[in-house]
Amino acid sequence: MRTQWVAKRRGQNNVSQMYYARQGVMTEEMDYVAKRENLPPELIREEVARGRMIIPANINHTNLEPMCIGIASKCKVNANIGASPNSSNLDEEVAKLNLAVKYGADTVMDLSTGGGDLDAIRSAVIKASPVPIGTVPIYQALESVHGNIENLTPDDFLHIIEKHAQQGVDYMTIHAGILIEHLPLVRSRLTGIVSRGGGIIARWMLHHHQQNPLYTHFDEIIEIFKKYDVSFSLGDSLRPGCTHDASDEAQLAELKTLGQLTRRAWEHDVQVMVEGPGHVPMDQIEFNVKKQMEECSEAPFYVLGPLVTDIAPGYDHITSAIGAAMAGWYGTAMLCYVTPKEHLGLPDAEDVRNGLIAYKIAAHAADIARHRPGARDRDDELSKARYNFDWNRQFELSLDPDRAKEYHDETLPADIYKTAEFCSMCGPKFCPMQTKVDADALTELEKFLAQKDKEKVAQ
């Protein structure tokens, strides 16, 4: 779809959506996004220019259907997929991608660390994906030196980053905010550093006693991103891995650096969103969102969860969706899903489905709470269908139509029950939805009550 759109931009030094927005140019991507969001195109351009919104759209991802991430638009959901050395392969990852898109993922991150040819897996995922694809290039950088962190060089990082950009990756997690002086701050934590990428950088700095190479070479990464319109997803290497560690000195020190890096990227018209925690008690979620907006000049916030309790392995799609809904309500722009397998293993297709639906619920609830235009329209339509016992319409409007129909049909599978005025919960005689109060009856009741009021006054 975008082949002709981007053809005229190739060869320019900067092809980012932010660059064009700041030049006053309305790109085709901005116009497309405006239609999807039902927002004025000029608002989209202004928000991208200001940095409060990004349109992750690598010029080499031409089959992309452009979308946006920002506080002015609907709350978005990311799904993670990825092969590991112990599980999964190319075909399985493409299948997970298709499933994620089916169930409403707005973006997908390929977090592959093994399981085959990483370049081939990434290429296949990008080719098959209508949604933006994100990656964490440090994983492949480590794989390229066979896991020997001490052998990694800044050139290794830059080489892999450019390779991902050339392939069409739309945004990349870059762990540039963790500095060598931050490392002593994790001493008081229960769970230390829980970011995979952050852990790699931390071990590199501890071995070499040198500053984070992604920080010292940040301007070179900016130059790569300008050429392909790759968006930064600034990684939170020091995100809390348990509620005990939430909002601590280490997390907030890195956040300050992420704000500085955000503004450095903006100086070159490169798009940025900022990643956030993690594990956060409910009473600290608002603080975390507001603090990010303050430190990062309102760049879009992209959070993993957050999980609001640590005691539910196997159900962390629920513990985190609670926090995600709150974070979205307070202004987070995108939620990274968590599956039931979080902390336990690599998610399979059913885990992807369950995690995504939990997060679509959270994002939608946030949109309603923020009074975004049209956010409740689907709810109202489903409520009408429910009141009218239009079962097929209810299934159709559900976030997971297959699951809704499956549960209904477990006890009432015959087609005749698709028009029945009850389900198996209440049966045919006790369903409260059968209580239909028509307008004439209400008019008669109002007359009766008015007469009673007159009689009381007369007394």
Curated annotation (Swiss-Prot):
Gene3D superfamilies: 6.10.250.620, Radical SAM ThiC family, central domain. Substrate binds at residues 80, 109, 139, 175, 195-197, 236-239, 275, 302. One of its GO terms (biological process) is thiamine biosynthetic process. Zn(2+) binds at residues 279, 343. GO terms for cellular component: cytosol. InterPro entries: ThiC, ThiC/Bza_core_dom, ThiC/BzaA/B. One of its GO terms (molecular function) is carbon-carbon lyase activity. Keywords: 4Fe-4S, Iron, Iron-sulfur, Lyase, Metal-binding, S-adenosyl-L-methionine, Thiamine biosynthesis, Zinc. The keyword Nucleus does not apply. Pathway: Cofactor biosynthesis; thiamine diphosphate biosynthesis. [4Fe-4S] cluster binds at residues 423, 426, 431. Binds 1 [4Fe-4S] cluster per subunit. The cluster is coordinated with 3 cysteines and an exchangeable S-adenosyl-L-methionine. Its cofactor is [4Fe-4S] cluster. It catalyses: 5-amino-1-(5-phospho-beta-D-ribosyl)imidazole + S-adenosyl-L-methionine = 4-amino-2-methyl-5-(phosphooxymethyl)pyrimidine + CO + 5'-deoxyadenosine + formate + L-methionine + 3 H(+). Its EC number is 4.1.99.17. Catalyzes the synthesis of the hydroxymethylpyrimidine phosphate (HMP-P) moiety of thiamine from aminoimidazole ribotide (AIR) in a radical S-adenosyl-L-methionine (SAM)-dependent reaction. Belongs to the ThiC family. PANTHER family: PHOSPHOMETHYLPYRIMIDINE SYNTHASE, CHLOROPLASTIC, THIAMINE BIOSYNTHESIS PROTEIN THIC. This is Phosphomethylpyrimidine synthase. It comes from Crocosphaera subtropica (strain ATCC 51142 / BH68) (Cyanothece sp. (strain ATCC 51142)).
